[in-house]
Amino acid sequence: AHRIRQLLNGSENLAAHANCNRVQDPYSIRCIPQVHGASRNAWQHLLELTEIELNAVTDNPIITKTAEAISGGNFHGQPLAMALDYATVAAAEIGNIADRRCYLLLEGKNGLPRLLTTNSGRNAGLMIPQYTTAALVTENKTLCYPASADSIPTSLGQEDHVSMGSISGRKFNQVLGNLDKILAIELRDAAQAREFRRPLPFSAWLEFQLRLMRQQV
């Protein structure tokens, strides 16, 4: 919430809506700090566990200074596997709520034209990119099944419980790639919506970011 206040500081557009007739915004706007914050907590948890594992002794067996061989289980990937699955859900949820905000920008309410175009009857505007976000969000949901909940015995039963952490890592990376695309579409939609809010400026930081984006799109 503090970060959002910083980003919006000095926005004349925000000030102009201080006493408008909108009682409550939809959850996807009003609950951004709570939803994004929950995802941030999940990623922080993954970071903490990753640092622990990077500094841990994971060899097996462990050879001591006295040349004693000690068999152990520090190599097991369950700590990271479960954290990666948790982080995957967190990343997918950021995309889920972003898609809802994209939809809000396109539905033709609160002074914005439908599909963010002035001729929505003949011009599809930004309708198709929202198809993309919807598809990517759905794909991310299918990738949220926790790989760490599964286990297949190997090595004649000696390795009878495995973490499937490599699968967790691959799924996390795939969801992050999809999330990049979803957020890029949301940014482009927001920039287009901004054009219909002129001449009132947003905050200096947001105006700067929009100018950078408009140099590319």
Regions found by a protein language model. Give the residues of each.
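C-terminal auxiliary extensions adjacent to catalytic cores
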Residues: A1-V217
